[in-house]
Amino acid sequence: MVPVSFCFFFLLLLLSAGESSSQLVSGPHITDVNILLPPKMKNPVEYRLQGSDGCFKWSWDHHDILSVTPEFNSSSHCSTSARLRSISPYSGRKETAVYATDIQTGMVIRCKVFIDNFSRIQIFHNSIKLDLDGLSMLRVRAFDNEDNEFSSLVGLQFIWKLMPESGGSTHHLAHVPLKESPLTDCGGLCGYLDIQKKLEDSGVFADLFVVKGTKIGHEKVSVHLLEAPLTHIADEIVLTVAEAMSLEPRSPVYVLMGASFGYTLKVMRGNVPQAVDLPSPHHRWSVLNSSVAQVDSLIGLTKALSLGVTTVVVEDTRVAGHIQGSSINVVTPDTLILYISPWSMSGDLITESKPFPSSMHWYVVSGRQYLIQMKIFSGRPDAHEIYITETDDIKLYGKDSDYWKIVSLPDELSSEYGQRNSRILNAISPGLGELTSTLTYFSGHQESKEVLKVVQEIRVCEKVQFTLNSEDDTPKVLLPWTPAVYQEMELIVTGGCAKASSDYKWFTSDISILSVSAYGIIQAKRPGIATVKVVSTFDSQNFDEVIVEVSIPSSMVMLQNFPVETVVGSHLKAAVTMKALNGATFSRCDAFNSLIKWKTGSESFVIVNATSEMMMLDELRSMDSSPPCSRASIYTASTGRTVLQATLAKEFHYFDKSLSESIDLKATLTIGAYLPLSVRQDSDGNHHGGYWFDKAQEETDFGVSKLYLVPGTYVDVMLLGGPERWDDNVEFTETVKTLYEDEEDLTSRVNVHHEVDRRANMYRISCQKLGSYKLVFLRGNLLGIDHPVPAVAEALLSVHCSLPSSVVLIVDEPVNKLDVIRAASQADRAPGRLRVTPVTVANGQIIRVAAVGISEFGEAFSNSSTLSLRWELTSCNNLAYWDDDYNSKMTKSGWERFLALRNESGLCTVRATVSGIDYSFKSQYSTLLPQGSESTLTDAVRLQLVSTLRVTPEFNLVFFNPNAKVNLSMTGGSCLWEAVVNNSRVAEVIRPPSGLQCSQMMLSPKGLGTTIVTVYDIGVSPPLSALALIKVADVDWIKIASGDEISIMEGSTHSIDLLTGIDDGMTFDSSQYSLMDIMVHIEDDLVEHVTVDEDSLSVGEHVATSSFKIAARRLGITTLYVSARQQSGGKVLSQTIKVEVYSPPRLHPQGIFLVPGASYVLTIEGGPTMNVSVDYTTVDNEVAKIEKSGRLYATSPGNTTIYATIYGSEGAVICQAIGNAEVGLPATAMLVAQSDTVAVGHEMPVSPSFPEGDLLSFYELCSAYKWTIEDEKVLIFIASSINVEENAGFVNVVQGRSAGKTRVTIAFSCDFVSPGLYSESRTYEASMILSVVPDLPLSLGAPMTWVLPPFYTSSGLLPSSSEPQKHRDGQSHRGNIVYSILKDCSSRADFERDTISINGGSVKTTDSNNVACIQAKDRTSGRIEIAACVRVAEVAQIRMKSEGIPFHVIDLAVGGELELPINYYDTLGIPFLEAHGVTTYNVETNHRDVVFIKTVNDQPSAYIKGIKHGKALIRVSIGDNLRKSDYVLVSVGAHIFPQNPVIHTGNLLNFSITGADNEVTGQWFTSNRSVISVNVASGQAKAISQGSTHVTFKGHGLKLQTKVTVLFGNTIYVDSPGETLTNVHVPAEGYKFPVKFRENKFAVTEHGNKATFNCQVDPPFIGYTKPWMDLDTGNTYCLFFPYSPEHLVHSMSITKDMKPHVSFSVDASLKEARRVSGSASALLIGGFSVTGPDKLNINPDSNTTIISLVGNTDVQIHCRNKGRLSISLIKRDDFGIAGHAQYKVNVLRSEQFTDRIIITLPATGQIVEIDVCYDTGESLVASSKDGYSVLLKILWGVLVLVVSVIILMKVIDRQVPTGATGTATYSGNAAQGTPERRSGTVIYHEESPRTPSPFMEYVKRTVDETPYYRREGRRRFNPQNTM
């Protein structure tokens, strides 16, 4: 153990040593520690002493000889440099010191300053030789007599002179002014160039001088000081100007032995290199080692002789010593390498490409040129390229090939690239070949040579090219883009010797605009232009590029490739494409398929899912069409036209201001559907020997394809369906043509006449001669505008002109229906065409008898009127006769007659015979009828006259119940009948009572099923029968037919209709409902089931009819369902419907006053809320207008009435609310305050108002508020309380200063403007007198006095013990602190009267204006002190005031929430300690569409939430007293989050934008980069140094700003607890967030104890925090108490996007320095609570129950025995942490059992168990036995527990005295024997879950200010267990 401890101690020493050393390196610094300055002169000399890594305060010793001027940075709070200047004339050498004190660390740096006179000066330079046209900077430096250099000469004046050295007039140097030179002083950080330039501009020179070489030669430069009496001090130098020389090839030059080459000499003239013609008279050449190389002295021709190194020198003879040299290295070669580089067709090397050596594979592109270079390198390791000369033997083979050609370089380029070692390769065609290069050289002796050889393989490839389907062959791709839609497109590429897709590499120039995959699939990212480059993996120079432009779609058009109309029941195809702003179509846009919404303007055209129809896509691709972006298939359900619309709408922000904020593209197309073209017979043949058709039936139900006509007759036909005329721009066709015809001319046998006068689609077809033909009717639209494809429909009609082959009679039918004709023609007949079977008809009536012609094919004729008919009656004398009068009235045709039947029964024969041609047609058609046709053209029928028997109803659905009965009624026939059922197990016939045998029959159900009841009338011959179908069934369903949501006004009743039936949809008659045991089930007592006769209470009563009534009792929403009992015993349930009970609607406010131009959002209080809409109207729109949202605009003075009408889902009016509005111009204004008096040091808000209204009526229209106070010694305005820029200047806050009265005045102007209707401006002035009440002369108790309201019981304010809970008296459970009220014993009445009393830990008050003090006595130590005093006062004022709302202005983000605390004050402005529930308050706003306000359960807070951008004024008032009001202006919009943060140096902070309507893009800026740096794009900031600055965000039309404060170091650290945080089963002490302090001046007080701190939670709606200290360990915490699920459900503003977990932060800040803060983030996972009992008792009468959950509804629920219980979810409002769910529990078995339902939340592991007991009412003997055993166990357990407690108490009694004594006598700091002190509070009653911060502040202040109070460790506690 000892070695381990020693190692640990040694490690700590090392760490501390390292820390100390790091501190020595870091810290503040200055540039100089010793400075030499001249004395005060005519021109002062300044020196800047620069500091770094600190913020300095400057001081110096001798203020008489030195001046120090600090310089501040941009923040004006920190000095990092100072200017030093001597201010005393010279009187000998002087010394002083300057001190730089770092205000952050306190470190002091000393700088010694010497002041002395000049002894000499000297010109300093970098070189005495400068180039021709070159610059040189000369500087003067001064020295004292000890040769110490002066630190600065800036500011002194000098005289500079230039003079030729030879004394001539030609100068070789010229002066360059400083302002024209390229010199800089780094913005003043590295020089004083600005001062030196000013000196030159004034005509003198500074210590800095710049010259330029103008001519070759020598020049004298002199300088002397222009400062009396030191003008004799001077200096002089000589500078040489020479011409700059350079040699090519560049040095060093490596050559082979025997090589010969010449140098090129270049000189700089005018900063341009120029070659010198050799030989030159001014230049001579030489070599240092002539054994290695030799050189020509005139022209510089050099030859390498032997291996070695030497130098060639060229000298300019005009300037002595001006030479230039080049190193020559004669070497042997080591390697020969070939290089290939791309070569442009223009003859230039492509410089950006890197040459490829022969060590790599060479790939070249067919059709391109390449430069091949042969290079030689010397030996390794330092290989150098050898300069190839004309004498070197180097060769290249393989010039001729099928794949390439090699040519020499042009002469003009041979000097640059080398004629000997460079060639140009022209690639011709793809293929593979080789090149060979050799070098022959001397190996070291002139006699022997060696050869280097290299062979290189070359592959020629095709050029890499994109394959684009571009019309203009421009390599450009256009792709669309919108946010979250990334269009993709595959690019096709060829060439590059590629064999697979992996042989290409893809690149994009801007990945933020366009991305590309490894397979060539590009994806659009944002708008812009990017270049996609594809490169062959074998050759990086073989590539192709395509420009891809990504743009936002500008328009959308329909593709004109499909028909726009089609026949009903088929599909129309449609497709759209999009275009860019320039009209170009996109290359691909199918990614928008899902975003483009298709819709039609009619329900007859249905959009079906056609995205997977590949045939349509293939069809589009095969067409010459633009690429489709979206496709649709439209099913045509019915006829008509509509507009097909494709819409692409999306809201977003762009990346620059030139782009709009949304996209809304539409493309429309008119489409239509028509019925199939058909021919319908329009003329009726019913009276003319033809068939009948119903003109009234639907046109699509009746068409004709064949017509049979007798010559001489006609028929009218009508065209139905087909396309209608499209429009005037589309040609419409409607024709008739012959498909085929007989030999004769068509016009001679048929006539088709278009009846234009009657109807456009009517044709008359008349038959002229015998024969057959077919007609084709064509109708439709051809090509035209918006009609790209013709749509022509056709219909065929066959016409037969012939004679009937037979006739048939139709008896007792109103018309000649085709089915009746067909049945009659197919009936059996006897000779003479007499129908065998008689036709039975009822007697006593007139019946119609008609004849119809039948063709040889059995088809009925359409018209046979050309033929005449003869009618005959046989054996009908007493039975029937022709009613001629009726015939003449009803018909004029001979093909139908009317027969009158007598009331007799029997047989009667009717015959009709064709007798010839009608007389009107005989002349033309007399020869058509053949001889002997009468025998065949006849028909006869026998009539059986009887009475008809009928049974009603013919179908009956019967409920299966023994008590059910079915009555059947019979009519007609005789009274002799028999009834038979075909299934006796379903029903039986019961004979009716006497007297009803002939009219009724009764059935009784016997079993489930269907049966047919047949009734035979045996009284007629032949017997007649009638049928009835009976179905016996059990009820399958019951339904509430009145709707799923019902709204009822409170106090009224509502009738609900029911339906019952079976699965096939048939319903029972209401007479059977009484047998179904129908019950009404209501969730709660909001509504009650009442009887129909009276409104008596009858909940659960049976329903015996098809409707029942409910009465609305209380407000709210409940559910209701009904049940019916089946015969099997089971129950069927209806759907559950919602029933809402609403109060009568009221318009809020019901009466309002506004000024012209003001607005106010009205709302409806009460009224229904389910599926309703509200319509607002005003009677007089000239006075006020109102929008649909309820926003009322005052326009001009007057009065009007406002109606708010509430409509249901079907448009019916449900109810109405009425209000009134007055618009006027107030004549005067007044100033309003909540009280006329205010105490000294206290505050009170004041605001203007009008007699007719308040601030809500006019504040938006007024401005220029000017506040004044007559006597500011009495009253003052609080600084910065008026913020006119925030439009809150209408509210001001005054504070009392001294006793007295004074007048407060306000003046303001208002512009009452209603655009186009009213305009007037007025100025108002108002004032009031306020009194300031002074403090009492001696009011030491005022700070420790609690203000409470009268007749009030406080929360537990009085702690009962100073000991922790576990050390209290375990027997009595009483604390050791006793409280009592101090009373005046001299007055017995006052003594006995308890005006203020103590109840436990609470204080109770009675009347107002009472004051009492509370005495506290410690029973342990006997100490007595005054704990506090209580004053009782009336609540007189109200405020919305907190630290976050200091000046009545709030900035709130959209969607953001904020809690507004409600505080109460007395008449003097003194706040109440508590006033829970004493009075009511109202919170109102003029714009409820901007801000949502919610108050919860009379809590002293109002919660607001930003709804949309805008401003709203919030007013809080005591009751309806508007004088007792306070105002807060809320501005809702986008904000920077977090607002006004405080961070520490080195920390990071992410800024973001909250509350914006859409996604915001822009840039971030900081006003001071030295304090904080911020990322321009992301908004991430880093604190650099201490200070304050502003962070600004600039976006599209948006500029936001917030202040940032940076503190030095982290002073407060907050950590998160490691456990899972939830709001269920919260620890009693809450969740602990450890808070740690850094020991600096912010965190330590003068007494050494930790300073107090505050805790806050954000967002505040999830819980509350309070600070706490563990007195034993000294650890400090923020205790977090989350609100329960029940509290969150009732207090939170519910939104749909809430989650079951909430991220929050806990912030801790010092009370003395709130900027010093820290925070920690954590995640709260919501739990759940079960509302209701923890045990469910269910019985057979109610075998279902409901389980309700609140909170986190992501639970799992199950029971142990699934065969007994079923659990189903019936309702779930998933609002995250504040959700609500209901589960329905059904009993499946009718047997007694117990079970347990287990509800589990997987996220937290929370488990809740609910016991279930199902009692059938059977014998409880067995359970009683079990109950006795359980009771015995409980009694035994209680007995054991009592004994254990007694023993434990005895043990504690023996140990308490020792512990108590030790605790009472020990008064030092906490040691091992000190008990653990964790709590000093017993909470008797808690009105609010939040710790009252005023109470904490007050107790601290009371304890600190109490005289003679001993601040011992035991006594210094906070009653709320807080710091």
Swiss-Prot record:
It is found in: Nucleus envelope; Nucleus membrane; Nucleus, Nuclear pore complex. Glycans are attached at residues 73, 117, 289, 609, 863, 903, 967, 982, 1171, 1199, 1550, 1568, 1743. Residues 1-22 form the signal peptide. PANTHER family: NUCLEAR PORE MEMBRANE GLYCOPROTEIN 210 (PTHR23019:SF0), NUCLEAR PORE MEMBRANE GLYCOPROTEIN GP210-RELATED (PTHR23019). The chain crosses the membrane at residues 1829-1849. Its main location: nucleus. SUPFAM superfamilies: Invasin/intimin cell-adhesion fragments. This is Nuclear pore complex protein GP210. It is a single-pass membrane protein. One of its GO terms (cellular component) is nuclear pore. Part of the nuclear pore complex (NPC). The NPC has an eight-fold symmetrical structure comprising a central transport channel and two rings, the cytoplasmic and nuclear rings, to which eight filaments are attached. The cytoplasmic filaments have loose ends, while the nuclear filaments are joined in a distal ring, forming a nuclear basket. NPCs are highly dynamic in configuration and composition, and can be devided in 3 subcomplexes, the NUP62 subcomplex, the NUP107-160 subcomplex and the NUP93 subcomplex, containing approximately 30 different nucleoporin proteins. Belongs to the NUP210 family. GO terms for biological process: mRNA transport; protein transport. Residues 1152-1205 form the BIG2 domain. It comes from Arabidopsis thaliana. InterPro entries: Big_2 (IPR003343), Ig_GP210_15th (IPR056232), Ig_GP210_16th (IPR056233), Invasin/intimin_cell_adhesion (IPR008964), NUP210-like (IPR045197), NUP210_Ig1 (IPR055096), NUP210_Ig2 (IPR055097), NUP210_Ig7 (IPR055099). The lineage of its organism: Eukaryota, Viridiplantae, Streptophyta, Embryophyta, Tracheophyta. Pfam families: Ig_GP210_15th, Ig_GP210_16th, Ig_NUP210_1st, Ig_NUP210_2nd, Ig_NUP210_7th. Keywords: Glycoprotein, Membrane, mRNA transport, Nuclear pore complex, Nucleus, Protein transport, Signal, Translocation, Transmembrane, Transmembrane helix, Transport.
